[in-house]
Amino acid sequence: MALDEAIACSVRQGGSPATLRFFGWLKPSVSLGAFQKISDIDTRWCADHNVPIVRRPTGGRGILHNDELTYSFSARDDGLFSTGLLDAYRKISSAFALGMRKI
């Protein structure tokens, strides 16, 4: 998650282009949403079962990750997505399709 924050910061500051990152998890892990309370998670169970808990820079609820492909997407909003929501979805979907072909 720290890498996603670093990428987003670099994109925001103009040091990197829009970036789509695909990644997996080495072992089962829980990711908490940016504003979610840690008390929402059974931390004792996670510790007893060696399940790490990390915090995402994005919102939402806790997610148990295991044997999956995860992605993050960072882009500035200064023109790339200025033509409307539907066009933004098309551009992001095209990036996903290209990324999946390269995997």
Annotated model-derived regions:
Residues 40-80:
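A glycine-rich, hydrophobic loop/mini-helix early in the fold
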Residues 1-48, 52-56:
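Active-site loop/lid in soluble adenylation, ligation, and acyl-transfer enzymes
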